[in-house]
A protein has these predicted regions:
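Conserved, single-site charged/polar hotspot
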Residues: 7-12, 16-509
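Sec-dependent signal peptide recognition
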Residues: 1-7
Length: 509
């Protein structure tokens, strides 16, 4: 929710239909889409630094709303604070409360919105459709992923937008509990700590910024050099005990992914988040010798296609068959993310693609030759009930009634479900691609078959954990343990992509 939401008008109105039109009054002039925010700096290929949000949407979202104080503590010694008004302080700990500050003039925000989307990737595809038509569209995540554009923009083909208008009359401001009493800070607030900042049971090196976002709230951002960032990502994504070649492959992918996605939160003034909506980023100091070696051995190496970092997506387990990009997200196929059986030649020969329904059943029943078959969710089973399906479709249950059927409408070449139909006595709801797992979060993947049991119950037999595109971490661990190099592993999962050093030959993120 945006702060000081005193008006929410014209929600779910089609293009060309404004509340003001009904009275004959002239529509209001176009306003800003969101609170003004400076874009994060461009990344220097020679000395790449990422702005990573350690905490987003900080502070209350409305007058009278409660928000916990922000506690910032130096690992040892002191923190140096400087706010935009030039105030400075050196203290071992900062405790920041929030005060609601009225605006001198109300801020009217008006935008046309597509979404919500299940992922940034799907939202970005819709944004690209708008941009191709000359519309200045941005991707934002107030809660779920959305695409915002000027209110008069015509919807791109295949999507129906809604108009959102809010009038904000105030916003939260940070108030430092100083020894001399409460002191209102002017953002952005910069923080430095020679020993690092204690955060989320770890220590981060910084420097840091407390800055405003596109929603009228605040974000705690760490400005972290790319190679140090990897120390906080690699062990948490693949596991510090993985074989060295698997760690090195993960380091290249994490680096490539970060650069390719450095625009992900541009609307909020930073590059990346620190949770599963980006790459899980935690205390870099916890990286062991093997992780540091993998990062050092691949220093500044990225995978590219036509000189640009690729979509370096990866996941835990593909269940024995990799997904194509277009099977996971709405978008065109990518030449380096293709569906493929992930196993030795004998397994590839047994299961030619596209997989037929009987072949998929056979693969799920066996497939132990596949790389990464020792993963805990290489094979799985889930039971869905009518009550659970009704919960999953939310408001749509009002027009379908209690679910009575569950049917796969479409599969991709790898056998993954592209469209899942939930049937009711009054209608149907179709979940597509990444929206399937967004709605049914208990499903480890979209590689599954459906069997109806007794009335109102369905059994799903599936394989893999994650979206299935790109590198399978379980598969990479298997291949590394068999002596494959990191380069060979990357060539296997991203055929045709080139391994390049960032900053050489004009290479830029």
């Amino acid at each position: 929710m945006l702060p000081a939401l005193v008006a929410l008008l014209a929600v779910l109105l089609p293009a060309g239909c404004r509340a003001a039109d009904d009275t004959g009054a002239a529509p209001p002039p176009p306003g800003p889409l969101h609170w003004p925010v400076a874009a994060p700096p461009a990344i220097d290929p020679g000395r790449p630094v990422l702005w990573v949000a350690l905490a987003a949407h900080v502070g209350p979202d409305a007058p009278g709303a409660q928000a916990p104080p922000l506690r910032l503590q130096a690992a040892s010694g002191t923190l140096r604070l400087r706010d935009a008004a030039g105030r400075t302080a050196d203290v071992p700990e900062l405790l920041i409360d929030w005060r609601w500050q009225p605006l001198e003039q109300p801020l009217r925000l008006r935008r046309r919105v597509l979404g919500p989307f299940a992922s940034f990737e799907s939202a970005e595809q819709a944004a690209e459709r708008w941009r191709a038509a000359g519309v200045a569209a941005v991707v934002a995540r107030p809660r779920d992923w959305e695409v915002w554009a000027p209110v008069a923009s015509a919807d791109p083909a295949g999507w129906t937008g809604r108009v959102v208008e809010v009038v904000a009359t105030g916003r939260p401001v940070p108030v430092w509990r100083s020894a001399k009493g409460p002191l209102t800070l002017q953002g952005p607030v910069t923080l430095e700590a020679a020993s690092g900042l204690r955060w989320a049971q770890g220590v981060h090196g910084g420097p840091f910024r407390l800055q405003s976002d596109a929603h009228g709230r605040w974000t705690l951002v760490e400005q972290v050099p790319l190679e140090r960032y990897l120390e906080g990502v690699v062990p948490h994504e693949i596991g510090a005990g993985s074989p060295q070649a698997a760690l090195a492959a993960q380091a290249v992918l994490a680096r490539t992914w970060a650069l390719r996605n450095s625009h992900r939160f541009a609307v909020d003034g930073y590059h990346l988040c620190a949770d599963t909506q980006c790459q899980v980023y935690s205390d870099p100091r916890q990286a062991g010798a093997s992780v540091r070696r993998a990062i050092a051995d691949t220093r500044l190496q990225v995978l590219t296609w036509d000189g640009r970092p690729i979509h370096a997506v990866y996941h835990a387990s593909n269940g024995g068959v990799s997904a194509g990009f277009e099977e996971v997200w709405s978008g065109s196929p990518l030449p380096y993310l293709r569906p493929a059986i992930d196993g030795p030649d004998s397994l590839v020969a047994r299961f030619p693609l596209p997989l037929t329904p009987p072949a998929l059943v056979s693969l799920l029943a066996d497939g132990r030759q596949a790389y990464g078959s020792d993963h805990g969710r290489f094979r799985w089973q889930r039971l869905l009930t009518a009550d659970r399906l009704q919960q999953a479709i939310g408001a749509d249950a009002g027009r379908t009634g209690r679910p009575t059927g569950l049917r796969v409408l479409e599969r991709g070449p790898s056998g993954r479900v592209l469209a899942l139909e939930i049937q009711g006595p009054s209608g149907v709801v179709v979940l597509r691609r990444d929206a399937i797992r967004r709605s049914l979060r208990e499903l480890p993947s979209t590689l599954f078959t459906v069997e109806a049991l007794a009335s109102g119950r369905w059994r799903l037999d599936g394989g893999g954990f994650g979206h299935g595109a790109g590198l399978s971490q379980a598969g990479a661990i298997t291949l590394a343990s068999r002596g494959w190099t990191s380069r060979r592993i990357l060539e296997h999962y991203y055929p045709g992509a080139a391994l390049q050093v960032l900053g050489l030959n004009g290479q830029a993120p």
